[in-house]
Curated annotation (Swiss-Prot):
Keywords: DNA-binding. Belongs to the SOSS-B family. Residues 111-121 have a biased composition (Polar residues). The keyword Metal-binding does not apply. It comes from Dictyostelium discoideum (Social amoeba). Residues 21-90 bind DNA. This is SOSS complex subunit B homolog. One of its GO terms (biological process) is response to ionizing radiation. Disulfide bonds: none annotated. Residues 111-183 are annotated as: Disordered. GO terms for cellular component: SOSS complex. GO terms for molecular function: DNA binding.
Length: 183
């Protein structure tokens, strides 16, 4: 199995094999075909939105480290999305400690979709130029960090530098100790 990094995912890729951590999970969306879950996943190179269905989506939680086998990518409403697919497999291989970056988020780039001039049966996607790109200074990508999250994970999913997270955890521990002493 050939693993790729998240930043190597391109539109209309097939048989994607990669390892990532779940950063966030959106609320379920009920459709007549089933229930859809949107999760934000990342590795040390980038992040991307992934769509999962039904029981699989219900089981996935922020902080889970997952291995995707046989996934695919597609453009949905001009945004790049990662999918498990009918033949894809997701395996939970760990929890909470995994180097990741939140930027760039591959699902935040808008894409133009059009027919491939060399093969009209295929669609191709090219990034749309951003009208604000020239006005904004270039941002350096966030360096990879290993985050250790404590339960409950959703409270720890804020975009805080590691030092601030550690300070916040220490404050929470002190508050818990004070509460225990008062009881």
């Amino acid at each position: 199995m050939n693993l790729i990094k998240v930043n190597e995912i391109k539109p209309y890729s097939k048989n994607i094999n990669c390892v990532f951590i779940v950063l966030d999970k959106g609320p379920p969306t009920k459709k007549k075909e089933g229930t859809i879950y949107q999760v934000l996943v990342a590795d040390s190179t980038a992040s991307i939105n992934m769509t999962v269905w039904d029981a699989l989506g219900e089981q996935i939680q922020p902080g889970d480290i997952l291995r995707l086998k046989g996934g695919y990518s597609n453009i949905y409403i001009e945004l790049l999305n990662l999918y498990v697919g009918k033949t894809g497999i997701i395996e939970k291989i760990g929890e909470f400690t995994f180097p990741f970056v939140e930027a760039p988020n591959l699902s935040s780039t808008l894409w133009n979709v059009h027919q491939d001039p060399n093969n009209p049966k295929n669609m191709v996607a090219t990034p749309k130029p951003s009208p604000h790109k020239q006005q904004q200074p270039m941002q350096q990508p966030t360096p990879p960090m290993t985050h250790q999250m404590k339960q409950p994970p959703m409270q720890q999913m804020k975009q805080l530098p590691l030092q601030q997270q550690q300070q916040q955890q220490q404050q929470q521990q002190q508050q818990q100790q004070q509460q225990q002493q008062q009881q």
